[in-house]
């Protein structure tokens, strides 16, 4: 599933081909995604693109009269292609640009979304989101105070978008390993030093993944069709039974909220 680094990688990849250009029209071959493609997108015509932003795992394409909100779901990806590129089976949405390029949305599992909003402030999918992990609003004392009294396992807790956005399964496992924190620990057990270290490594892990173009495990590709390379940097995720790269202890796995968690029993306490 594309997480924050993959979405940010997509944003950076598509922005130069959209901003300052005009969407001539949208071609929707299959509107039945997680939610039906919004009618306003189906009727787009000669709409200049003003900006491409990201909030959590949502891409926000700013137009003159509103915003397209794109969520990549479980298996979605965006690519920039020549306008007349032949679509394949899972290519569901195209934004045809005045430059002769097309932004193509591919989603084999169709769990993604293409939505419309007149204003970001009134969008229900953006309401109640927590702070951005790479911004100054996500800091040690915030995390420490928010964790007081929480009995939920720390792994599951930091994946809650109301706590902090965009820390999905891969990066939660990797960040907890880097911080030396066992994923089963109650969130409320964090002390101030734990919170300081965890905030710092979350920022580092996410930033490194963005620099590497994200993590390609199955479906994610960058906007130029290339894979992300952060998978080569993974210390615990997907390495069940393999030796820890720090101490040699076999990596273990457990379930948190129906998600697989990977950790080292010796390095994480």
Curated annotation (Swiss-Prot):
Binding positions (DNA): 90, 109, 150
Active site (record annotation): 2 (schiff-base intermediate with dna), 3 (proton donor), 57 (proton donor), 259 (proton donor)
Cofactor: Zn(2+)
Cofactor binding note of this UniProt entry: Binds 1 zinc ion per subunit.
Molecular-function annotations in GO: 8-oxo-7,8-dihydroguanine DNA N-glycosylase activity; class I DNA-(apurinic or apyrimidinic site) endonuclease activity; damaged DNA binding; zinc ion binding
InterPro entries for the chain: DNA_glyclase/AP_lyase_DNA-bd, DNA_glyclase_Znf_dom_DNA_BS, Formamido-pyr_DNA_Glyclase, FPG_cat, MutM-like_N-ter, Ribosomal_uS13-like_H2TH, Znf_DNA_glyclase/AP_lyase, Znf_FPG/IleRS
Functional note: Involved in base excision repair of DNA damaged by oxidation or by mutagenic agents. Acts as a DNA glycosylase that recognizes and removes damaged bases. Has a preference for oxidized purines, such as 7,8-dihydro-8-oxoguanine (8-oxoG). Has AP (apurinic/apyrimidinic) lyase activity and introduces nicks in the DNA strand. Cleaves the DNA backbone by beta-delta elimination to generate a single-strand break at the site of the removed base with both 3'- and 5'-phosphates.
PANTHER family in UniProt: FORMAMIDOPYRIMIDINE-DNA GLYCOSYLASE (PTHR22993:SF9)
Family that this chain belongs to: Belongs to the FPG family.
Subunit: Monomer.
Name under which the protein is recorded: Formamidopyrimidine-DNA glycosylase
Species whose genome carries this gene: Pectobacterium atrosepticum (strain SCRI 1043 / ATCC BAA-672) (Erwinia carotovora subsp. atroseptica)
Lineage of source species: Bacteria, Pseudomonadati, Pseudomonadota, Gammaproteobacteria, Enterobacterales
Gene coding for it: mutM
